[in-house]
Amino acid sequence: MGGMTVLKLYNTLTREKTDFRPIDPKNVRMYVCGPTVYDFAHIGNARPIIVFDVLFRLLRHVYGTDHVTYARNITDVDDKINARALRDYPGLPLNEAIRHVTERTETRFLEDAALLGCLDPTVQPRATENIPGMIEIIETLIAKGHAYEAEGEVLFDTRSMAEYGQLSKRNLDEQQAGARVAVEAHKRNPGDFVLWKLSAGHEPGWESPWGRGRPGWHIECSAMSGRYLGEVFDIHGGGIDLIFPHHENEIAQSRCAHGTAVMANVWMHNGFLQVEGRKMSKSEGNFITIYDLLHTEKFGGRKWPGEVLRLAMLMTHYREPIDFSIKRLEEAEHLLSKWPVHGSASGEADPAVVAALTDDLNTVAAIQALHALAQKATADARHLGAFAASAALLGVEPKEIELDEAVVQEIDGRVRERLELLKSKNYAEADGIRADLLARGIQLKDGKDPETGERVTTWEVKRSQV
């Protein structure tokens, strides 16, 4: 179906939604900025993880599972990591402390992503494994007049690129310096940003033509995307907060180093996330990690399944701001509870679900179509294959519900009690037991034993309110 389905994607670069035409349909390439591994991922970080996982699934559906390359980096060199290492492991040499921080944080991130139902990206490069590529790009930028050395740093000269500010639509004269760069006298322009900086003796560093040092924030992604996807690739994604300065500076570095008209053809950004109507922050007391949500009772007094968090995120279009709340999680859980548990996703995905997703990842419409299909599948098992394949596109797949043994025994007892009531023709009380169990998500099925002809009753969990 690859030649038949056309995706429409909103491109931040052009501020338009247009047909997506990959450079090479046999190798569609997407890069998404991954975590800086100094702290555990919070629910705001979960949004791009989930959104671009859905896009990855959709691209694989349209172009084939072997024809999509998805790169999501791990930033494991950063001053925030250094600070966290000094705080958490004061008795260790800094490099060893840094390794402890990055390894534990990366491991937790990958566990979180898996519990949110995300596929592994094709490649997950670490910044520390790509330092030579960064140095090479910086050397090229200096040689081409786009970068300069000053007081132990190598800086990008923003005035050297006529189209700087194109992504964020900022005029260079109006711009403030980048988020991680202080305005200092040694800069030619206030907006010039660091490509390389010298490291003190105790700090992590790599040998370079400019002395032992470490890379700036932005050069890392230019090097890793270029290495794994090429000088120009199809899609670059991330949160809306990365448009400036990070993505703007990535574009400047890559285009000026490679002499290309674009870095990526399509730039996609997911919207901001608030918690219960307020900006999420530690000072507000509403800072929630993915781990906290899934494994503790810090939010709403209970643990939440990963598929509930995932569906709650997808119930808002990815470009819209999202207000994350207990109510939203409850709504997502209620919706999931009405969907059939299924096995293999061997059917054909529902055209209405595919059509919604190919319209700039309209997950809201896709969920509505999936819910309609769920109702059909509940009534007629022939629709289960289509439901399973469609749910797999969203990565939201209802799980089998495991009940405590005590609950199972209690339900079995109620079923036996009902059978006795039916034998004595006490239908009203028997119907009352059926209704009580159904209200808890337990559906009874009456039949006959083929050998004895006696009435038998089986039950199954249809909803998650048990």
Swiss-Prot record:
A Pfam family of this chain: tRNA-synt_1e
Keywords of the record: Aminoacyl-tRNA synthetase, ATP-binding, Cytoplasm, Ligase, Metal-binding, Nucleotide-binding, Protein biosynthesis, Zinc
Database matches in NCBIfam families: cysS
Q: Could you tell me which Gene3D superfamilies the record lists for this protein? A: HUPs
Q: Which gene encodes it?
A: cysS
Name the Gene Ontology molecular function terms of this record: ATP binding; cysteine-tRNA ligase activity; zinc ion binding
Positions of short motif 'HIGH' region: 35-45
Tell me where in or outside the cell this protein is found.
Answer: Cytoplasm
Cite the binding residues for ATP.
K282
For this entry, the protein name equals Cysteine--tRNA ligase
Binding positions for Zn(2+)?
C33, C221, H246, E250
- Cofactor binding note of this UniProt entry: Binds 1 zinc ion per subunit.
EC annotation from Swiss-Prot or TrEMBL? 6.1.1.16
- Listed GO biological process terms: cysteinyl-tRNA aminoacylation
Q: Where is this motif: 'KMSKS' region?
A: 279-283
Give the multimer and partner information. Monomer.
Cross-referenced PANTHER family: CYSTEINE--TRNA LIGASE, CYTOPLASMIC, CYSTEINYL-TRNA SYNTHETASE
InterPro entries the record matches: Cys-tRNA-ligase, Cys-tRNA/MSH_ligase, Rossmann-like_a/b/a_fold, tRNA-synt_1_cat_dom, tRNAsynth_Ia_anticodon-bd
Q: Which GO terms describe its cellular component?
A: cytosol
Cofactor(s), by name: Zn(2+)
- Similarity annotation: Belongs to the class-I aminoacyl-tRNA synthetase family.
